[in-house]
Structure formats: C-alpha cells, structure tokens
C-alpha cells in the first residue's frame, strides 16, 4: 500500500501544469487554475502523508524526513525558489529534536510579501500505534501544495502578482510552535532572504501571514446540516474578510463561512492568538489569518485517517482559499 501511495504522489510531482497557448487577447483568470484543485489530487496527498512511510510525521523521525523531502520535490516541481541554496531550514525543537521547515518562494513583481504556511508535523507513532493526522494537519499541507501548484500554473500562463508568496511547510508545531518561532527568528534576524535579490525580508515588508491548520474535517459544523463550512479567524480591521466573502460568492464555492470560533470570544482568542502558527507573527504586529474547520473528536486519535475526510468539501475549501489569495496578491 505504501508503494501505491508513493507512486501516486510522485505522479503529482511529475504532473505538468503547462497549458496550451492561449489565443491572442485572452485574459488570464484565476478560474484557469481551478481544475488543479481536484478531489483525487487532494486524496492522494493526504494518503501519502498519513501512510506508514511517514510514521505519523513526528519531528526528528525518519517519517518526518520522508514528508519533508516530498514537500520539497513538489515545491521544485511548481517553480518555487529556495533561499540560501536549500528548501530546508533546520532548527532544534524545544525537546531537542532535529527539525526542518520547508520554504519556497513564488516571485511576484514587487517587494512585498505574503506568507502562506501549514504545519506538516504530527504526534507520530506511540507505543507501536500510528497516529495518521489526516485532518491534523495532512489536510493543511495538501492544501498548501495545491495552492502552490495553482499559482505556479497561473504564472506559467503569464499572470503576474505584486506580492511574492512565501510558501512554508512548518515543522515542530506540536512542540510549542517551534517551527513558526524559528521562521520568525529568521525574519527578525535578517536571515531569510529573497532569492531574486538577496535582500533580507523584513517584518515591515510582510503584508499578511496566512496559516492553514485543519481544513479537512466536517464533523464540527457551524450550523446544523451544513458540513460545508470554513472558519477564517482574523482581526476585523486587517483580515480582509470581504475578500473571502466575495471569493465565496464569485467562485461559486458557497461555503458556510464563520469569522470566529463557534461564536465564543474566549475560544477565538485561544485559537487565533495562542495555539497555532500565526502566533509569532501576531505577537510582532504582522496581520495574520487562520483558516480552519476546527478541532473534532478525531484529533490526536488513530481515527484521524485519510478516509475520514470529505474530499468534495475539502476541494471547495481549497478553492475558497485560492480565490481569497488571488484577490489580495
């Protein structure tokens, strides 16, 4: 079974996104990339990251290395550029585990940046039992890779965006957000450089941080009989909620959207400000957004497996995030 998933995953890496030449006068639209957000592709990605090959993706394990390598291969296939000669940015977690963020740049036409991130680590294999972590957070990594593929496709068609997108697959989230803290320290220390210019990326040049954390589940809906939901947690004044509302309607996604955590100010504060990877950015004044479908009873259980996700709804969520980003880039 591992070989089957690995072969299918490699086909995604090799799958070309180049399109036939467009007729003169053709206006490139974000809709030209929608076909890349397909249920089969999302299912294949989640199946790979939850397979026994990745052993639950705990930081510092061989399974984590398999996950990192697969992410880097897809970054390369989708034209994302490494910085400092490598996609891998190594650090130690709070427990001392050797961990790596995977970082790739999709160049824009200006000198402003949007960070799009999702953590790939999970709790691993404990006492011989594999914890797959499909929703948490193979779903986020599958979404991240699909978004990278979609924006690369538009760039190949000739579309340009003002912002450079920094795609980051984060390690060490399960160890006190070690990966996102390390990413922030790279930025604060002038160590993260634009591969086009070699210029350090400063806090002031980042217009938005977008974190994708659990976007595959459907078991904790906002409203009865609406499993097709998505939450975007952000500050009202800088989260650009209107962009998501417009994207949800214009792209014909029509999800049930929420902008707080189930109506609770306290839980919204915890999930937005404390326990996910946008925290280091928020702590330093960078506008940030978190996309999530919320915690379910499957979290950190063996039942959080690839078959527990609804890939039709998952696809619609990816489309909503894609069109949201396309509007703000």
Report residues per predicted region.
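Structural recognition of the beta-strand scaffold that forms the well-ordered cores
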Residues: 48-50, 101-105, 113-117, 166-169, ...
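Alpha-helical metal-binding/catalytic segments enriched in His/Glu/Asp
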Residues: 104, 116-117, 122-177, 321
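His/Asp/Glu-rich mid-to-C-terminal helical/loop segments that flank catalytic regions of hydrolases
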Residues: 292-329
């Amino acid at each position: 079974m591992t070989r089957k998933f690995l072969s299918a995953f490699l086909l995604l890496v090799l799958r070309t996104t180049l399109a036939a030449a467009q007729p003169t006068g053709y206006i490139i639209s974000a809709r030209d990339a929608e076909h890349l957000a397909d249920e089969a592709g999302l299912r294949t990605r989640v199946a790979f990251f939850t397979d026994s090959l990745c052993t639950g993706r705990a930081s510092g394990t061989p399974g984590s290395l398999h996950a990192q390598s697969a992410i880097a291969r897809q970054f390369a296939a989708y034209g994302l550029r490494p910085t400092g000669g490598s996609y891998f940015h190594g650090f130690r977690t709070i427990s001392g585990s050797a961990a790596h963020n995977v970082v790739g740049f999709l160049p824009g036409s200006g000198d402003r940046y949007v960070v799009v991130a999702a953590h790939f680590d999970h709790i691993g294999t404990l006492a011989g039992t594999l914890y797959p972590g499909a929703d948490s957070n193979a779903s986020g990594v599958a979404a991240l890779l699909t978004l990278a593929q979609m924006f690369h496709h538009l760039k190949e068609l000739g579309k340009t965006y003002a912002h450079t997108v920094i795609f980051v697959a984060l390690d060490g989230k399960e160890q006190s957000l070690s990966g996102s803290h390390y990413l922030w320290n790279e930025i604060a220390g002038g160590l993260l450089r634009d591969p086009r210019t070699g210029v350090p990326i400063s806090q002031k040049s980042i217009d938005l941080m977008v974190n994708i954390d659990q976007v595959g589940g459907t078991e904790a809906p906002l409203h009865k009989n609406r499993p097709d939901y998505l939450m975007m947690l952000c500050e009202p004044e800088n989260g650009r909620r209107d962009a998501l509302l417009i994207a949800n309607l214009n792209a014909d996604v029509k999800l049930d959207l929420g902008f707080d955590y189930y109506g609770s100010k306290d839980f919204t504060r915890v999930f937005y400000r404390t326990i996910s990877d946008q925290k280091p950015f928020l702590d330093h004044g960078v506008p940030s957004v978190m996309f999530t479908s919320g915690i379910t009873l499957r979290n950190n259980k063996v039942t959080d497996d690839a078959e527990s996700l609804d890939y039709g709804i998952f696809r619609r969520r990816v489309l909503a995030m894609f069109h949201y980003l396309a509007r703000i880039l």
